[in-house]
A protein has these predicted regions:
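Vicinal oxygen chelate
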Residues: 2-21, 43-91, 101-125, 136
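Short glycine-/small-residue motifs
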Residues: 133
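Conserved active-site tyrosine of GNAT-family acetyltransferases
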Residues: 33, 37-38, 104, 128
Length: 136
């Protein structure tokens, strides 16, 4: 990957350097899934091929990768016994929670029925992955 990471993004443990490149999200259509986050976050596509897309923020750093899995099943949340379980979610800091939620909905997200915190909004992307918007 040719994008440079920001200074300090690499840690060294026992002589080995580590830097998080991306979090990978699977769906039945990686290209459509990536398009949602491209529009939502304003990130740049740095690699795209059938079934695989990599997005990075304009300033560099770790990003999101998207992989097609034809057997992907969206999670059920809150969790229910016997249903597909959520394995991860994205926490996205925003500086205006109401405006960010409105924008996410306009991009194609839905508001999750269950909202466990007053200062966080749980949303669902078009592929069924949960993500949270929060202010600090």
């Amino acid at each position: 990957m040719s994008d440079e990471l920001p200074a300090g993004a690499t840690t060294h443990v026992d002589g080995v350097g580590y830097s998080l490149s991306a979090t990978v999200l699977e769906s039945r259509d990686a290209n459509a899934h990536a398009d949602f986050y491209r529009r939502l976050l304003g990130w740049t596509t740095i690699d795209e091929e059938p079934g695989w897309v990599i997005l990075r923020p304009p300033g560099g750093g770790s990003g999101l990768s998207f992989s097609t899995d034809e057997l992907y099943e969206p999670p059920v949340w809150p969790a229910q016994p016997g249903a597909q379980q959520m394995q991860d979610h994205l926490d996205i800091h925003v500086d205006d929670l109401s405006a960010a939620v409105e924008r996410a909905l306009a991009c194609g997200a839905t508001l999750a029925e269950y909202q466990p915190q007053d200062d966080v909004r749980v949303l669902v992307d078009p592929a069924g992955h949960l993500f949270c918007h929060f202010e600090s």
